[in-house]
Amino acid sequence: MKKEYNVNRKYLNEKQFSVLRQRAVRQAWKNEREFVEETGRGSRNWTPLAKDELLKNGKVKGYEGQHMKSANEYPDFAGDASNIQFLKRRTMDKNEHLDAHKGDYRNPTNGYYNAKDRKNS
């Protein structure tokens, strides 16, 4: 039996759900770029080089969009760009994304991950 996700009272198959999640991450990067262009600040404390890369390329290498509220547990948030935060991935000196999942990507997340304190809130 194929898995379906109830998203805002509409049922999506796994492929549709994956596309929805990816779309939210892409939109979050666009929003982040606009925010940095307008204010000079971002949703995280980007280095000057990272800001330049974001403005030039629309994203920052080594970072990925993380759904703060688990898309699997809270499917209504899967397509919400405001549910995305940018975390260092495993190719960096730290793996904030894995840390947000408490060491196992199968562990759901439920909130903002504070990399400094290494805690979800």
Predicted regions and their residues:
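Nuclease and nuclease-like effector domains acting on nucleic acids or nucleotide cofactors
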Residues: 1-64, 69-121
